[in-house]
């Protein structure tokens, strides 16, 4: 019986759980699907929405949208008031998290999140 006490990429994202399942090794904790979904913050928020659970308002921003930063900033500002917090969808814990109090800080935070996202 394996007790996976791992954190972050490959430890919490379903990778190691999938390896255990392929090798038919019993382990404790969440399975592959639950681990993979919960590691991705956007997927988790979508599921929480579908379940009707209240959560903070969020604006998903995809990496390819960052080519038109003015549009992204306008989209965020149309839905949220400053300060806003930016978090990569697939980075662990507080890695890549930034607080932005204006449009310039938001641009910087979005670029930083894109770099830190796994």
What spans do the regions from the language model cover?
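Conserved N-proximal alpha/beta basic substrate-recognition cap immediately N-terminal to
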Residues: 1-62
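Active-site nucleotide/adenylate-binding loops and adjacent lid/helix of ATP-dependent enzymes
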Residues: 37-118
């Amino acid at each position: 019986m394996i007790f996976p006490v791992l954190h972050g990429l490959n430890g919490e994202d379903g990778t190691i759980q999938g390896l255990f399942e392929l090798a038919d090794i019993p382990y404790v904790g969440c399975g592959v699907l639950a681990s993979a979904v919960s590691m991705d913050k956007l997927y988790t928020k979508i599921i929480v929405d579908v379940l009707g659970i209240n959560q903070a308002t969020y604006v998903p921003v995809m990496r390819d949208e960052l080519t038109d930063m003015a549009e992204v900033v306008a989209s965020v500002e149309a839905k949220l008031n400053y300060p806003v917090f930016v978090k990569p969808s697939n980075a662990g814990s507080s890695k890549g998290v930034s607080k932005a109090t204006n449009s310039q800080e938001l641009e910087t935070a979005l670029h930083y999140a894109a770099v830190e996202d796994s």
